[in-house]
Amino acid sequence: MFRIVLLAVMAALAFGTPARALENENLLVTMPKGYKIGFQNKTARELMSEMVPESETVENWTEMVTVQIFFNLRDVSPSQYRARVEKLWADACPGSTFAKVKEGIENLYPTQTWTQKCPVNKQTGKPELTWFKGVQGRDSFYLVQKAYKFEPTAEQTAVWASFLDRVKVCDTRSPTQPCPKEK
C-alpha cells in the first residue's frame, strides 16, 4: 500500500524547512513503496523530484518516478504541453510512438495522461517507455512521470496507471477543490 506523502512535505524535508499545513494550490502525489528520492532541485521556475527504487540510483535506473511543478506556468493546457514534449521526444528518438490514455477534468482541473515510447534510447541503447500525467493548475503546471527502461508487464502497467490516477491537485482557497485535512 502506498503511503501518502505530499510533495510539499517532501520538498520541506529535502530543503530543511519545517513541514506546515497545506496552503493554496498543492500537488498530491504518493511516495511509492520501496522508492527513495534520488534527486531533488528547486529553482525560481521549477521544483523537480526524481524517485527510484531503493536499490537503484538516478544515474543507473530501470524505473523512475519524476514529479515536476512548473511555477507560474498557467496558460498551457495538458494537450499543449503534451504536444511540446512529443516533438522533443520524436526529434531525440526516431520511431517514437505516442498514445493518449485519458483526458478530462479532475477536481475541476484540466488533466491528460499519455504514454511515449522510444524503441531505442540513443544514450542507453535500451527501450524507454514513459507514462505522463499533466495537470493545468491556476498557479502552476504539474507533471508526474513514470518511466521504464524495459517493456512493463500488464500487472506493472495496471499498478502505475492506478498510481497516476491518484495524483491530484487541490486548492485550500477553493471549497470546490478541497485539500485533505491534516491527521
Regions found by a protein language model. Give the residues of each.
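Sec/Tat signal peptide C-region and signal peptidase I cleavage site
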Residues: 15-21
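Secretory pathway targeting signatures of secreted, lumenal, and periplasmic proteins
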Residues: 34-74
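Mid-chain, structured segments of secreted extracytoplasmic proteins
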Residues: 63-106
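A short, surface-exposed beta-strand/turn
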Residues: 126-141, 147
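Surface-exposed amphipathic alpha-helical segments
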Residues: 139-183
